[in-house]
């Protein structure tokens, strides 16, 4: 399942002293942080299974560290996101085979909607990022 999240980073950059590139990175990193934070965890495998690719969907990580806090995963995603340039597509994906069952539910499991919930809040997350950027500038 591919979901597109489009945020007008140029409009955000115009309201800020930051460059478009910086706003692009910060908004994308905040979205990645939010989806990792919203990911349910028991052992941390699902949170640790998030990965990022630029311009083309890639293949899941060969080995995954359990990451109940999500901190290592967010750092790994952020490192890749900072390589992106304006115009790149950033794919944030989860390689755990059971992720879709938790996201959408089954006849035995209620849906958790951790991805869809984050996508639905993307505009609010971008506004919060802008507010944080502006606060740093003052």
Describe each region flagged by the PLM.
Residues 1-138:
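Short, Lys/Arg-rich flexible segments
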């Amino acid at each position: 399942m591919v979901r597109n999240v489009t945020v007008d980073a140029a409009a955000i950059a115009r309201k800020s002293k930051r460059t478009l590139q910086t706003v692009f990175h910060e908004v994308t990193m905040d979205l990645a942080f939010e989806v990792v934070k919203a990911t349910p965890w028991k052992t941390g495998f699902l949170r640790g299974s998030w990965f990022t690719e630029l311009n083309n969907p890639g293949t899941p990580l060969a080995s995954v560290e359990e990451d109940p806090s999500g901190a290592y995963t967010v750092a790994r995603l952020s490192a890749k996101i900072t390589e992106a340039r304006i115009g790149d597509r950033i794919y944030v994906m989860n390689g755990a085979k059971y992720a879709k069952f938790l996201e959408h539910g089954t006849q035995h499991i209620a849906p958790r909607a951790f991805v869809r919930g984050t996508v639905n809040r993307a505009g609010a997350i971008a506004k919060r990022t802008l507010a944080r950027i502006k606060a740093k500038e003052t």
